């Protein structure tokens, strides 16, 4: 299924319904930085949303809620992931700003340069809205 067709709301809701409290969501990314090589692991601490047509909230009808995403990922879970990766001797990037694009196409060179100039380190197609939807349902997410 292409990333822009994933029903993120249904997936996150289902996880909440079965009692999940914490989500570790690995994803494939492209690097926008030369020091982030294939095989390295980047633990995002920020994201930039460049998607267009995704259902990105549970609060689009009735109740209105404004959820803070200033720090979108759980610091404790991030630290656990960083520690585990270091124990396994992986090349870990402890901070990364990840830009999420709509897909299914990859970015152009011009877009990648723009994202790099914005401070993005990695690029993918599935981080958003998953991380925000999880936060709306009080699920811990990285």
Where in this protein do the model-derived segments appear?
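Metabolite-binding pocket within alpha/beta catalytic cores that recognizes anionic/polar moieties
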Residues: 1-70
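Non-catalytic positions within long, well-ordered alpha-helices that form the structural scaffold/packing
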Residues: 16-17, 116, 135
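General beta-strand structural signal in soluble alpha/beta enzymes
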Residues: 23-27, 43, 92-95, 99, ...
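Active-site glycine- and acidic-residue-rich loops that bind
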Residues: 71, 105-106, 118-126
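Active-site rim beta-loop-alpha module in soluble metabolic enzymes
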Residues: 72-114
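A structural signal for small-residue-enriched, beta-sheet-centric alpha/beta enzyme cores
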Residues: 127-136
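Conserved small/polar residues in nucleotide/adenosyl-binding loops
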Residues: 140-142
């Amino acid at each position: 299924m292409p990333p822009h067709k994933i029903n993120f709301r249904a997936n996150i809701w289902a996880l909440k319904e079965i009692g999940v409290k914490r989500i570790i969501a690995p994803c494939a990314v492209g690097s926008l930085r030369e020091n982030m090589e294939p095989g390295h692991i980047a633990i995002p601490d920020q994201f930039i949303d460049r998607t267009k047509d995704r259902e990105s909230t549970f609060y689009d009808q009735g109740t209105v809620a404004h959820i803070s995403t200033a720090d979108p990922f759980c610091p404790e879970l991030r630290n656990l992931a960083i520690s585990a990766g270091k124990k396994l001797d992986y090349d870990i990037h402890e901070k990364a700003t990840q830009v999420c694009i709509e897909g299914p196409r990859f970015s152009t060179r011009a877009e990648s340069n723009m994202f790099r100039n914005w401070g993005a380190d990695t690029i993918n197609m599935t981080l958003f809205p998953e991380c925000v939807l999880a936060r709306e349902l009080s699920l811990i997410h990285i």
